[in-house]
């Protein structure tokens, strides 16, 4: 316990003397990759409610959906619903790429908003297997326009399910990372459909263009010796390093103390940290590719027409899917699917459509938006940060550091989020 | 028409029978021949990560699925009922009580591993929490700086050089390995031996019923303390991630570095 306090104290105090003077922002972790992996130390998070009224929703979004036996456990789209007893505004929250409705970051946002008196419904990312299986019309995720339509349908079903139980004064919307970009497209769709009339829309660390952000994440894997195709060797090496550190460090268990020690002792180099982030991303992407391939019977990694039973080994598919890059998915699977339906669609035009720029007129004109971003977020370029500034003006809140989502749970960031939805 | 009826029939089967696999439902697509996928394993020359010896994967996956259904229809409803009728304060005291009983297991295994300081610490914890902590319901020992060291016979075997052996998913207990399953049996044997020697209810004719009640509540409490839910991540390769995390955590905590 004392060790833990000491470590946290080091973590918080050490970088401060140099930083406090210039920007007055208290989030302590300076490195972009390090912040992304470490997130926010618990003492720097806001106080969350001890108890919440919360329940799981399992939604039948697409009636009579046939699910392959390998996904026997998937009983519908899973959303988390936190509700107030009195009349309150309802906020929908969308998870980032590959994340479920219960991802830690999403649940933290939910808790902070619940604390401030909101009803909240969290949704998994359209790139999460549960969404692909239960809520994606095409089964092919990643297109902002189609994902927004799927999300909108899911939100309508969720609302129908709970509207008898709660009183709602208004609707708002939020999302982080890819979920933030999707939130923008959902809001735009809502201007036509008018089911919710979203009052406020918050985008936390959005990519400006999904394609270029994916390129930047793939770049991280290039820092691995031998590149992404040797990620298995790299991972196993990092694992030995991790184990040895534990073994000689006299730790009691794999817990926060241990993880902070990894950071404070700089166990992994900057490049290795980058590689680990890239690998995490690939592991997520693999789940999406596999789920999509099975649902559409496309013969991409699973033989076409093979029916996987619930006890079949997926080991080889796991290895294959984790070795496929975003470019493989995009060029061999994703773009061809859209090109088949729209033969005149060029690749450039398609990439451009996966961007906030494609709806910038709308984003600029609507006062309901705000974007939170970090100067050192590696999924966006300096130019893209400037673009967000220019697009949203005063409604863009740019922090000097935090990496990608590392500072999302920092109390100042959470306070900004809550105030935005309140005002 | 045949297909439609078939699908309907499949969906009407009561949920419990889903524990058996569903080859019947799949018949519609199986008629068409399989085709080679665009990407297959032969393309990649790389080590597998998250790899663990798992020769009984078919059995393990069946058990993994069994545990999912057992949780869903038996275990979790009981745990939820327990959490509903028992105030949070009482739940914490009950957990403390059982965690304190498990210190006996921690102590015997620290001693088996000839770890002097750790054994003394654990003994100190057990004595402190049993007395000042009112039978373990409270944990003053941690405040006095006596950290908990979880030990079991599987770790003892590992400490003395036994490798984990193949991965094994046990019914109800969940992820384990051949070595840890043996360890589990030994730990149960030792507790049973101690229990018989101590004989806490010598004059009661209901001794058996009382001890059955205590171990049932212990099982419920253990599940209550364990937040893991089968398939909750929704990640299609969850089985491998769980297998990997279980295995590595055990390897690391046993004090052995993984094999290159």
Residue map of PLM features:
Chain B
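Hydrophobic helical h-region of N-terminal Sec-dependent signal peptides
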Residues: 14-18
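Post-signal-peptide N-terminal segment of Sec-exported extracytoplasmic proteins
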Residues: 44-76
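A structured, mid-to-C-terminal "fold-capping" secondary-structure block
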Residues: 36-50, 160-260
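Mid-length scaffold segments of soluble, non-membrane domains
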Residues: 96-178
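Bacterial N-terminal signal peptides that target proteins for export
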Residues: 2-13
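Membrane interface segments of multi-pass transport proteins and intramembrane proteases
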Residues: 73, 78-89
